[in-house]
Amino acid sequence: AEFLRGKTPWHLKVDVALPCATQNELTEEDAKVLIANGVVCVAEGANMPSTIEAAKAFEKAGVLYAPGKASNAGGVATSGLEMQQNASRDSWSFDYTENKLAEIMANIHDTCAQTAEEYGHAGDYVMGANITGFIKVADAVIAQGLI
């Protein structure tokens, strides 16, 4: 690794970038530097660490971009597994929990990819995650009789 005094880590030449800190930390300017340096994949590990403009720059450049609402879901999923374990007064092994989490994350990936393809945006994980999220909320609203 290399430290660049006075610059963000987004100025390093990397294949994969993982913004995992604060909202809007990775800007359009940062995205353009990453793209120029040959980044192949950006996977968010926080809630919206990339600005909308940065996400659009990645899309335009053909960079594989995984939005936090999908790629960062592991923490929320693990909390849900912990609540389930506690409610059942059970004790799960690390391997059992890890396997359940892997299943959840694989399902999120597959659902986002399939939904994007179904709606004519194959490979667009942002579109797949957004449409999937909208459908889940809409189905819940309808199931509750609110519409």
Regions inferred by a protein language model and the residue ranges of each:
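A structured beta-alpha segment of the ubiquitous adenosine-cofactor-binding alpha/beta core
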Residues: 1-30
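Adenosine-phosphate binding glycine-rich loop
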Residues: 35-147
